[in-house]
Regions:
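Catalytic pocket-lining loop regions of alpha/beta-barrel enzymes
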Residues: 2-3, 8, 16-141
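A generic structural motif
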Residues: 10-11, 108-113, 163-169
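Active-site micro-motifs of SAM-dependent methyltransferase domains
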Residues: 11, 88, 113, 148, ...
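Mid-to-C-terminal alpha-helical segments outside catalytic/metal-binding sites
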Residues: 130, 134-141, 146-176
Length: 176
């Protein structure tokens, strides 16, 4: 394995639940990163089996919050963590954790979707440029699920920053 992805909203569990701690301990032992899905999800659409069993489709998930991620990082300060979707609507909280912890990264997956849902709306270009300015390209990577490389190519970034985002950060983190 090169890493794991945690989608707490699908399982309805809190990422800082004590039962999850053995997962993070194993990731530390194996020296592999944990990619946390970040973003609000309608329980009905994110978990079809729950909706089929009568779950309220208008109830939003309250698991996988920045506060839970902070608890995990405080408990395991050396755990390699990636925040998917650059933290989505929790961007600034996740950015703060990535600034504080040397081993926290962000990916660029689905930024167009999450950026268009921000108030005020933010373009992918603006979002990536902001993150590079305040976090550094060494901690940002191309997202593996629905990201278009031309979005990064269009940013006002140096060749080194673009190289980091389009592969070098990932190569370093996953030891490829």
């Amino acid at each position: 394995y090169k890493g794991i992805k945690v989608l707490s909203y699908q399982g309805g569990f809190h990422v800082d639940d004590p039962i999850q701690m053995c997962t993070y301990e194993k990731c530390l032992e194996l020296d592999i990163p944990v990619l946390f899905h970040v973003g609000w999800h309608n329980a009905g659409s994110a978990n079809p089996s729950a909706a089929a069993n009568g779950a309220n489709s208008c109830k939003y998930s309250c698991v996988g919050t920045p506060f839970e991620f902070a608890n995990v990082l405080e408990t395991f300060p050396e755990l390699k963590v990636i925040f998917a979707h650059m933290g989505a609507e929790n961007y600034f909280r996740c950015l703060g954790m990535a600034q504080r912890f040397h081993n926290v990264y962000m990916d660029t997956a689905w930024l167009e979707h999450y950026g268009s849902n921000q108030l005020p709306q933010i373009s992918v270009k603006e979002w990536i440029e902001h993150a590079c300015k305040y976090l550094g390209s060494e901690k940002i990577m191309f997202g593996g699920e629905y990201t278009m490389p031309w979005e990064i190519e269009q940013c006002d970034l140096s060749d080194k920053q673009k190289a980091d985002l389009l592969g070098e950060t990932c190569r370093r983190l996953y030891k490829l």
